[in-house]
Curated annotation (Swiss-Prot):
Gene: fhs
Keywords: ATP-binding, Ligase, Nucleotide-binding, One-carbon metabolism
Designated name of the protein: Formate--tetrahydrofolate ligase
Pfam families referenced in this protein's UniProt entry, alphabetically: FTHFS
Enzyme class: ligase
Binding site for ATP: 65-72
An example Gene Ontology biological process: tetrahydrofolate interconversion
Gene3D superfamilies in the cross-refs: Domain 2, N(10)-formyltetrahydrofolate synthetase, Formyltetrahydrofolate synthetase, domain 3, P-loop containing nucleotide triphosphate hydrolases
Similarity comment: Belongs to the formate--tetrahydrofolate ligase family.
InterPro entries membership: Formate_THF_ligase, P-loop_NTPase
């Protein structure tokens, strides 16, 4: 079979104007960016405000493995198959970060014959939204350091006289706002800035990947431009010498940051290999951020289609949990059905059984042992009151015997049902049965519920997430986290939801624990306020907000030929 980029390149895309017209957009509601993509205005949602929302389907997965489970393939394949079945369907996915593209994971356009095209345009830059987030974020970092420099140089009283501004009295040891870049760069995790007499007080800083920026979360959670502006104004950038928060509004930089991001608030419209519409907007990671595409994209798609299919990053303990307790809490747009993606390889890898057998070879012992992980994820999603369809993403090496055993095993669970998907190799035709089942699931009664209420304490929310969300026996807080919990409660941030940053490779905090971890303590090492996004991030165990490149990164395979064709992009 050809590579993803070869399949993408050999396909002739429809003009994006035709995709927009078929979707129901008026000419003044979108702005083409070349021939393959377009920015879409929120005015379409206002025009169709009285139209009933589409049924929303959320795609999640079992605990991820290095082999890839195929969530995006399933999301795109389902969209293609739904449309083939005569149901007007639109996909909504995140914009890929160049960190994974040039690192280990690769791009996020789907794959095979279930992908968004042109895949190189999606995976590299798109319409520049991530760069806008980076620029706005780093403007705030520059602004806080400049203010610190001038107040320190002149003293508070002289500064106020010369600038006409009130001194903020920034505590250089409590500057919370780091810098960002859209690459994996471990050497920038911890740095010191301000060296030299004319460069400001020396203080610690560091870089996160742009996908972990609070601005990326704000972009994904904002309802409109006004909401974006207000959320940016609420960003807490530092503490003053009295321990009180200093916001972007107080620093006077919130307006300029919003201006940089003004165009980024519009989702980008592209198409699948079948010519189906797909919105791409925002790109927060699911392990260190909330891991879902934007509310705005969902809102627009909901008025134009009969079914909207979106995906949440990593397993259901990660992206789906945050989709439910953060995104839906904000949007009020609850799912009518869910899809849990699984592969035979994923279950074998999650079995916890060491074996010399090739993971692609039949191994009923490991498959049966690993099934517990799938059942855990089915139960996890079911507790939110949403019908669960299991999508078995078939690989060429899978045997009929193992697939049939898995389908029968799913029948004994709380799942609505299961179907095999061959969207990767066959496109829409490979997922029509899955699409039928998912559509029927959307027509059954659902009773979506949150895992916890906003008015419960942060400590109670952490305990609920640990015990009910991950199966932990208890929660432990470091001394730093305890101090931060006290500060957050004192400053009235206790009503915010929790965004857990942890390893995605286990339901627990320890990536080496496979299957269903039990009787473990969830160690909270740090609590970070995201006042603009509207949640508190709880760092669990050893988690990094800036990834690093591996020993054989993806960029080694990427090049461009004399005709301008990109080579080796995965």
């Amino acid at each position: 079979m050809q590579s993803d980029i070869e399949i993408s390149r050999q396909h002739t895309c429809l003009p994006i104007t035709e995709i927009a017209k078929d979707l129901g957009l008026n000419p003044d509601e979108f702005s083409p960016c070349g021939v393959n993509k377009a920015k879409v205005s929120q005015s379409v949602a206002r025009r169709l405000a009285d139209k009933k929302n589409a049924k929303l389907v959320i795609v999640t997965a079992v605990t991820p493995t290095p082999f890839g489970e195929g969530k995006t393939v399933t999301t795109i394949g389902l969209t293609q198959a739904m449309n083939l079945n005569g149901i007007k369907t639109c996909a909504c996915i995140r914009q890929p970060s160049m960190g994974p593209v040039f690192g280990t994971k690769g791009g996020a356009a789907g794959g095979g014959y279930a992908q968004v095209v042109p895949m190189e345009e999606l995976n590299l830059h798109l319409t520049g939204d991530i760069h806008a987030v980076s620029s706005a974020h780093n403007l705030a970092a520059a602004a806080i350091d400049a203010r610190l420099f001038h107040e320190h140089r002149l003293g508070a009283e002289v500064f106020a006289q010369e600038s006409g501004l009130s001194a903020l009295n920034i505590d250089s040891e409590n500057i919370l706002w780091r810098r960002v870049v859209d690459h994996n760069e471990r050497s920038l995790r911890q740095i010191k800035v301000g060296y030299g007499k004319v460069n400001g007080p020396v203080h610690e800083s560091g870089f996160d990947i742009t996908a972990a920026s609070e601005l990326m979360a704000i972009l994904a959670l904002s309802q409109d431009l006004k909401d974006l502006r207000q959320r940016i104004g609420r960003l807490v950038l530092a503490l003053n010498t009295q321990g009180e928060p200093i916001t972007a509004e107080e620093l006077g930089v919130a307006g300029a940051m919003t201006v940089i991001m003004a165009d980024a608030i519009e989702p980008t419209l592209m198409q699948t290999l079948s010519g189906d519409p797909c919105f791409i907007h925002a790109g927060p990671f699911a392990n260190i951020a909330h891991g879902n595409s934007s509310i705005i994209a969902d809102t627009i798609a909901a008025k134009l289609a009969d079914v909207v299919i979106t995906e949440a990053g990593f397993g259901s303990d990660m992206g789906f949990e945050k989709f439910s307790n953060i995104k839906v809490r904000e949007s009020g747009y609850a799912p009518s059905a869910s899809v849990v993606v699984v592969t035979l390889k994923a279950l074998k890898a999650n079995s916890g059984i060491e074996s010399d057998k090739d993971i692609n070879q039949p191994d009923m012992e490991r498959l049966q042992a690993g099934f517990a992980n799938l059942e855990w994820h089915i139960n996890n999603v079911s507790q939110y009151g949403v019908p669960v369809v299991v999508a078995i993403n078939r690989f060429p090496t899978d045997t009929d015997e193992e697939l049939e055993w898995l389908k029968q095993a799913v029948e004994q669970t709380k799942a609505f049902g299961s179907e095999i998907s061959e969207a990767f190799g066959k496109g829409a035709e490979g997922a029509t049965k899955l699409a039928d089942m998912v559509y029927h699931a959307t027509q059954t009664p659902s009773d979506f519920k949150l895992l916890y209420q906003s008015d419960t304490s942060l400590e109670a929310k952490l305990m609920t997430l640990a015990e009910v969300g991950y199966g932990a026996s208890s929660v432990t807080l470091s001394d730093k986290a305890k101090s931060q919990l006290h500060w957050l409660t004192k400053h009235n941030y206790g009503q915010l939801p929790i965004c857990v940053a942890k390893t995605p490779m286990s339901i627990s905090h320890d990536p080496s624990i496979k299957g269903i971890p039990t009787e473990f303590e969830l160690p909270i090492t740090e609590l970070r306020l995201n006042a603009g996004a509207g949640f508190v991030t709880a760092l669990v165990g050893q988690v990094m907000t800036m990834p690093g490149l591996g020993i054989k990164p993806g960029y080694l395979n990427v090049d461009i030929n004399d005709d301008g064709e990109i080579i080796g992009l995965a």
